[in-house]
């Protein structure tokens, strides 16, 4: 199995997110940027890299992917709100597929982690339209696979639609 992303896959994800976002009347770029950073930290927390007292740190794979899928949702939403074009999709796909990401996103390296955590807010607010989307897809490619992340995202979006329909998480105030 290759760990590649296609333009068709990315365009499908962008459309799924656009369809979902159309259900959110209060959608706005600033809140989406904040949510993106929050979701990064929620995903990062599932790695438990700092829990050196545990024999096997890290939440189960499905929990990790669920949180990263949330980050992907906001990355897609940010791209859509910033009017991503097909040329940007090609740029994201080319970057994801071209780079090997060797030794990238090593959150077990304390110095790297400190630098990354300091810069995450700058990355999400960068003027380059593809940065938030590229970042989450690259993390997905390094720590899991593109297909695992896409599958987790689609599963999460089904649940998010159910929340908006009032058929899931009724007691959590989604509708």
Question: Where do the protein language model's features map onto the residues?
Answer:
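Flexible "arm" and connector segments at domain edges
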Residues: 1-175
